[in-house]
A protein has these predicted regions:
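Substrate-binding cleft of secreted/luminal carbohydrate-active enzymes
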Residues: 34-146
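Aromatic-lined carbohydrate-recognition surfaces of secreted/lumenal glycan-active proteins
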Residues: 1-31, 78-91
Length: 146
């Protein structure tokens, strides 16, 4: 699921909690009943694409990885646990590889707000040899919670 909730309604998807009052935050497009169609409470777990460019990892706004995850936590209202993560092969700055130093930052930005981390797409880890970068990111995270 794409974490860009402010525009995801355009494809007819309301992944938020039905307890979340969408119309209060998005009165330009959400009706008072839009919240009734949220389905987060029907899921066991959710993967949310926090797809942003290499220079949009940290921040509080919706359009960066950390912000996507922070917003998702608010929208899901505890109804379902979720993992957020980047697209490391198609988003701006990621398409040519060579961004290994950014991988630990993506893990930090997403996993510390969400309930987990995922990456799209595994093929890019192999293609750009990001294995050690992921290991460093997860090791850093595990060391931070001990």
């Amino acid at each position: 699921m794409g974490a860009w909730y402010s525009t995801y309604y355009e494809v007819g998807v309301n992944w938020a909690s039905p307890k979340y009052d969408t119309a209060a935050d998005y009165p330009n497009w959400a009706t008072d009943r839009y919240k009734d169609y949220g389905y987060a409470d029907m899921l066991d777990f959710m993967l949310l694409g926090a797809y942003a460019s290499t220079d949009e990892i940290y921040g509080s706004g919706e359009w960066n990885m950390q912000g996507f995850c922070t917003n998702a936590k608010k929208l899901l209202m505890g109804d379902v646990k979720f993992a957020g993560g980047p697209d490391i092969g198609n988003s701006t700055g990621w398409t040519e590889g060579g961004q290994g130093d950014k991988i630990p930052q993506t893990i930090d930005a997403c996993i510390n707000v969400a309930d987990g981390y995922f990456v799209f797409d595994m093929v890019h880890i192999k293609m750009y040899d990001y294995w050690n970068d992921f290991k460093k990111g997860f090791d850093d995270y595990l060391n931070s919670i001990q």
